[in-house]
C-alpha cells in the first residue's frame, strides 16, 4: 500500500506493483534530504512520516532490511540507538558502533534516555533563533534520531506487567514527539 485516498462514498487504495523490477541493490539505498530510497519508485520520507513498522514471516528478510536501513543511515549525520532483546544480529553491531543495547536494563535505560533527549531537544528547538511553529528538527539543521527496536513485542513479553506498561508508555510518548523533535 503506497497511498490511500478518501473519495465521496469510497476509498481508493494504491498498491505497489512490479516489486522485482523496481528493486535496487543495497548500495543504492540512500538517505538524503529526509528520505530513504528503498526502491526505484519508493522512498520513505522519514522527515514527514517518522514511524515505521517492519513485519514479515520468519526468514523473510526483516533483519537484513533493518541492517540495510542502518547502513544507509550511518552514511548521514543521523543518531542511531539500536535495541536487540534477543542479542542476535543487530546486537553484533555493538562491536563496530555505539548505542547498541541487548540487556533488559540497558534497553529500558536507553528508551528512557531517548525520550528525555527528545524532550530536551524539543525545548532547545523552541529557543533556537530560527525556530518556527510547525517545522521540525530538519528545518533547524539538526540530525534525525532513530530508535531501532528489533523484536519489541518479544521484549515486552520478557518484562513484568509494571515494566511492560512503563516501557509502552515511554514508547507512546516517543511516537507523539516523533516528527517534531
Ranges and model annotations:
Residues 12, 37, 134-137:
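Polar low-complexity intrinsically disordered regions enriched in Ser/Thr and small residues
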Residues 126-138:
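Short, glycine/acidic-rich hinge or "gate" loops at secondary-structure transitions
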Residues 1-13:
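Long, basic/Gly/Ser/Thr-rich N-terminal segments
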Residues 14, 18-126, 143-146, 152-181:
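P-loop NTPase catalytic phosphate-binding loop
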Amino acid at each position: 500500500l503506497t497511498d490511500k485516498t478518501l473519495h465521496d462514498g469510497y476509498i481508493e487504495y494504491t498498491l505497489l506493483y512490479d516489486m522485482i523490477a523496481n528493486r535496487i541493490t543495497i548500495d543504492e539505498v540512500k538517505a538524503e534530504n529526509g528520505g530513504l530510497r528503498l526502491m526505484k519508485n519508493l522512498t520513505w520520507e522519514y522527515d514527514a512520516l517518522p514511524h515505521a513498522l517492519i513485519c514479515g514471516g520468519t526468514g523473510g528478510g526483516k533483519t537484513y532490511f533493518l541492517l540495510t536501513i542502518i547502513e544507509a543511515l550511518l552514511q548521514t549525520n543521523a543518531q542511531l540507538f539500536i535495541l536487540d532483546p534477543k542479542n542476535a544480529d543487530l546486537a553484533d553491531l555493538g562491536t563496530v558502533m555505539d548505542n547498541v543495547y541487548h540487556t533488559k536494563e540497558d534497553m529500558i535505560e536507553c528508551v528512557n534516555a531517548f525520550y528525555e533527549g527528545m524532550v530536551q531537544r524539543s525545548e532547545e528547538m523552541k529557543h533556537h533563533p530560527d525556530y518556527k511553529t510547525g517545522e521540525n528538527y530538519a528545518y533547524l539543521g539538526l540530525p534525525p534520531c532513530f530508535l531501532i527496536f528489533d523484536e519489541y513485542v518479544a521484549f515486552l513479553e520478557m518484562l513484568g506487567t509494571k515494566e511492560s506498561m512503563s516501557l509502552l508508555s515511554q514508547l507512546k510518548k516517543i511516537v507523539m514527539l516523533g516528527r517534531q523533535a
